[in-house]
């Protein structure tokens, strides 16, 4: 029996990719707490200049990731997903190492852009698992996998802050590079994939990819849903600490309270994603998606009327529980409506929409709060999510009518 005939242990692959997503999520968020401080250390002075450069180095990674994702997705469909995981982990490790050696802000900005170009571990992990797991377990598997990145993103800022306090800013980049190299080694030694490379001539072109989809309009609506999920999440990020300060008044531990309120949605998503993914396998991911979107609207509106930080924390915890179902439901529906032959590109297109949402969300939140105040951000975000719920419901209804 040749190696390619040996059955894939998808459960082991799920465990290893979960660890990889955890390490990648932690690595990305390790440097986030002190990013403005590092920008300042590289010679940027003045309040407005510091704000501008901090925003640039943050957003340029997502911008270049959105541009590069379709290319890497196409290459994954040609060469396999494992090799893309290896490329991403090793590439990001090298870039993080170089970031710790940056001597000026322009070098750092270019390296942040390069990080976006070479990224893509998590969407390729999703594509790998989506093509290996039995279809009736897709929701549970992708929901479980999503908790890896969420867990890493939750622990990363805490670990990054502690490491920066003890060892300084530059060593954290070297530690982050080591974490990503461990991710590379785990992928190299423990993930298995039976993949027959496809020649460039045999690759489906974009039109053929669209034609091969079971429901192209529904897939587009799922991409838009991914974008709006990230816009809704990102729109609140720039104003959260200031809003908490407005609610809390003059307290000494505002940083702790803000950090706790920022992290509770992630904790809730961590708890809810596998369970709601499993429920989606039973009743259908489309029902989970629509209900979670409606619940999100109903939770966002009262956030604009809260009077204490703890009321906001409770609502954000419940919002996180609902949000934990959204991306896994979208990904499961993408699996149902595409073939393994194009999975890499479909998940990479979805990642591009996610990255665009990561860039536009904070810009939208900052613009609305500057013109209308903090509370207006929650109302506008609720309106955007409500539009998406109606749009998604209409797309899913058309699909159901077409089937009937």
Swiss-Prot record:
InterPro entries: MFS, MFS_dom, MFS_MdtG_subfamily, MFS_sugar_transport-like, MFS_trans_sf, Mutidrug-R_MdtG, Tet-R_TetA/multi-R_MdtG-like. It holds the Pfam family Sugar_tr. It is a multi-pass membrane protein. One of its GO terms (molecular function) is transmembrane transporter activity. Keywords: Cell inner membrane, Cell membrane, Membrane, Transmembrane, Transmembrane helix, Transport. SUPFAM superfamilies: MFS general substrate transporter. CDD domains: MFS_MdtG_MDR_like. The chain crosses the membrane at residues 19-39, 56-76, 90-110, 113-133, 144-164, 171-191, 222-242, 254-274, 288-308, 317-337, 376-396. It is found in: Cell inner membrane. GO terms for cellular component: plasma membrane. Belongs to the major facilitator superfamily. DHA1 family. MdtG (TC 2.A.1.2.20) subfamily. NCBIfam families: PRK09874.1. This is Multidrug resistance protein MdtG. It comes from Salmonella schwarzengrund (strain CVM19633). The gene is mdtG.
